[in-house]
Structure formats: C-alpha cells, structure tokens
Amino acid sequence: MSYNYQHIIVKPIGGRIGAEISGVDLSSNLVEDVVNEINQALLQYKTIFFKGQHQLDDIGQEAFAARLGTPLNHPTVPTKKGSNHILELDSRGGRADTWHTDITFIENYPKASILRSVIAPEVGGDTVWANTTAAYEHLPESLKVLADSLRAVHSNSYDYAASASITTEQREKYREIFTATEYET
C-alpha cells in the first residue's frame, strides 16, 4: 500500500512495522488534512513515532488523541489526577514489562494507544511493537487454516493471577491503583 503524503514527512523505520513522522507540531491546532494523513500513516505502518515533541503536555496529548478518535480509558486503572484519559506509568513496579496488548480484553477495544515519554532513562526503557497482521499474512497456508479454525477466551485475568515478589507496601499501592475487575471476550 502506497500513499502520497502532502502535509507530513513519513520515514519508514522497519520492514513490516513503524514509521517516524516529522514536520508536525502535535501541540498545535492541527488541520484536518494533517490529521487524516497521520491516521493514514497509522493504518499503513501500525506504529508511528513523533520525536522532539517536548512542548506536548497532558492537555495537548488528550486533544491530539481526540482528533484520532474517541479516547478510551483503561477499565481497571484510574486516570492521572487532573486528566481525563491519561494513564500515568513510570519505571517503578514493572507493570508492563511483558508482551501484552493494551485493553484488548474488552468488547470494544481501542484503535491505538498513544504513549508519551516525559522522562526517558539514558539506557533501557525500550518499548517493542509487533505487527500481528504481517505475522499472520506470512504464515504458511496450512497454519492460516489452523489459526482461522481456533477460538479462544480473551481475558485480563492474567493481570491478577500471579503474585509478584513485591513488598507488602508495593502490593497495597498496586491494589490502590488497579481495580480487580475481570473482563472476558
């Protein structure tokens, strides 16, 4: 799929996933043509990056997210104090240090997740993405037939299944933040 971008600069960064977008200030009042092209790049590349957006604050992030669609709050984790939709994560606690998908255990799952690094570590802190569409498309036909015949229960119960080796204080803090509501689709 090829698209002729007129309002943003799109530089692919991987064979099957990812592009860096430049020539746009996400904190500004973006014109509809720019928003449409950002959406097109998201569809085409699955993961898009905007570097150097230091001027973007919580209000700007929420405004940008709303231009891409209706923001969806995490059903079991409260939003950041003073925001409508932002889920604040930090490097402590290892809450997302395994392969996962964001909120896909609910019936009407989000189109995308928007991450904004406010303070990045000098080393580590890497986030990795996978293109499951490309993975499926490159399966041998026999495995596609098998995959198409399978059914599964998708749930967030894993979030509560294991007891991590954390202190009592950390566990209490975790329970303050997370609501132990299980979803299943």
Regions found by a protein language model. Give the residues of each.
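Non-heme Fe(II) oxygenase catalytic core, chiefly the N-lobe of the double-stranded beta-helix
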Residues: S2-T185
